[in-house]
Amino acid sequence: MSSKRAKAKTTKKRPQRATSNVFAMFDQSQIQEFKEAFNMIDQNRDGFIDKEDLHDMLASMGKNPTDEYLEGMMSEAPGPINFTMFLTMFGEKLNGTDPEDVIRNAFACFDEEASGFIHEDHLRELLTTMGDRFTDEEVDEMYREAPIDKKGNFNYVEFTRILKHGAKDKDD
């Protein structure tokens, strides 16, 4: 009997349970969006995000991440990343430390000059052709209140601030 117990302990490490009800932190539509994002990253469809899934997802976006970079991303999780752990990690990021960095860094991946701007046409192309694709109408909606200068440059640093803190009043 004890040999069976010893054998069971050598199997794959099980994901840790979330300590709080992470599903109560988000509404149904947000949870659905997170599920779609999780499924996009879980390239091999095994219900867990691993280093290979991250590599394949980033490669599909034209990136060539180093092993060290991927290890750094994976080390943020205390164990295997199933959907509940994924949601917990996002909940901690959104409600804890500064999520502005995360949002800004997502845009910065496509800002080759590190200027804080992405041309609106290029961003529209990215949003409508990659990942969870936006429709042209959704991009138009996003651009309606977005900080875009006369040359068509989308200021993602300011946009990130607006997302997190709201737009400044016109009177300011």
Curated annotation (Swiss-Prot):
Keywords from UniProt, A to Z, are:
Acetylation, Calcium, Metal-binding, Motor protein, Muscle protein, Myosin, Repeat
- SUPFAM superfamilies in UniProt: EF-hand
Which residue ranges does the record annotate as region Disordered?
1-20
Amino acid composition bias (Basic residues), ranges on this chain: 1-16
Give any GO molecular function from the UniProt entry: structural constituent of muscle
Q: List, alphabetically, the Pfam families matched.
A: EF-hand_7
Q: Which residues cross the membrane?
A: none
Q: Does the keyword Nucleus apply?
A: no
In which residues is Ca(2+) bound? D42, N44, D46, D53
Q: Where is the EF-hand domain?
A: 29-64, 98-133, 134-169
One of the GO biological process terms = myofibril assembly
According to its UniProt entry, the function of this protein is described as: Myosin regulatory subunit that plays an important role in regulation of both smooth muscle and nonmuscle cell contractile activity. Implicated in cytokinesis, receptor capping, and cell locomotion.
> What's the further remark here?
This chain binds calcium.
What protein name is recorded for this chain?
Myosin regulatory light chain 2, smooth muscle major isoform
